[in-house]
Amino acid sequence: MAQTLNRSLTDLGALLHLVDPTLPIGGFNHSNGLETFVQQRVVESKATLEEYVQTQLLQNWIYNDGAYLSLAFDAMNEGNFDRLCELDWQLSATKVARESREGSFKLGVRLLKIFIRYETHTLLTAYQQAIAEKRVQGYFPIVFAMVAQAMGLTKADTLYAFYYNAAVGAITNGVKLIPLSQMDGQDILFDLRGSLVQAVELSLDPDEEWLGAATLANDIRAMQHEVLYTRLYMS
C-alpha cells in the first residue's frame, strides 16, 4: 500500500512540475492570436472569452497540438525515434502562422533543456541532438509528450495536463487583455472541467486524417498579430 501511494504521489509531483506556470520557458509571452481577437473586439467579455477557449479546445487543439502530443506519446512507448522526427516535421507544416510556429519550438527547446537534466532516456538525448543538428525543431507538444512518457506518466493524465495548461494560459491572457476580473477567469476555468475531459477522450486515439484541421479565424488572427501597431505578446 505504501509503495503504491509513494508511486502515485511521485507521478503527481512529476505532473505538477511539468505544468508548473513558473517554469522558465516563456509561455506567458504568447497569446497565439488571442491578442488580435481582443483588439478587434471579437473577444471582449467573459462570455466571448469562454467561447474562444472552448472553441480552441474542441475545434483546434484536439486536431493539432493535442493530437500530435498523443501520437508522440505512442512513438515514445514504441521507442520509435524516426516517428518522433516525422511528427515534428508534420507539425511544422501545419503551424501556418510564423509567430505561433516559432513560439512553439522555442517553448519546446526550453522545456527539454530543463527536464533532460532529470530524466535519463535515450530518446530525449537523441531528440536534443537532432535539435542541435537542425534535423528537427523541437515543438512544444512533442517535447511535452516525450518528457511525460519518460517520467512514467499515463497518456490520459498527460493530455489532461497539457490541455489544462493551455486553457489556463489562454484564460490568463484574456483576463489581462480585455480586461476581466480574476474571479471571471476562475469561473471560466471551472466551467471547462467537462470539456477538458471530453478533449482528452477525443485525443487518446486521434484520427490522422484530421491532423492539422484548423480554425481559420484563429490562424488569420495569429498572422495579423505580426503587424499589430501595439502588442503585449510575442504571438
UniProtKB/Swiss-Prot annotation:
Coiled coil: none
InterPro entries (alphabetical): UreF (IPR002639), UreF_sf (IPR038277)
Predominant localisation class: cytoplasm
MF terms (GO), sorted A to Z: nickel cation binding
Subcellular location field: Cytoplasm
Keyword list, A-Z: Chaperone, Cytoplasm, Nickel insertion
GO CC aspect terms: cytoplasm
One Pfam family linked to the record: UreF
Description of how the protein assembles with itself and partners: UreD, UreF and UreG form a complex that acts as a GTP-hydrolysis-dependent molecular chaperone, activating the urease apoprotein by helping to assemble the nickel containing metallocenter of UreC. The UreE protein probably delivers the nickel.
Protein family: Belongs to the UreF family.
PANTHER family: UREASE ACCESSORY PROTEIN F
HAMAP family: UreF
Protein function: Required for maturation of urease via the functional incorporation of the urease nickel metallocenter.
Protein name (record): Urease accessory protein UreF
The species this protein was found in: Haemophilus influenzae (strain PittEE)
Taxonomic lineage of the native organism: Bacteria, Pseudomonadati, Pseudomonadota, Gammaproteobacteria, Pasteurellales
Name of the gene: ureF
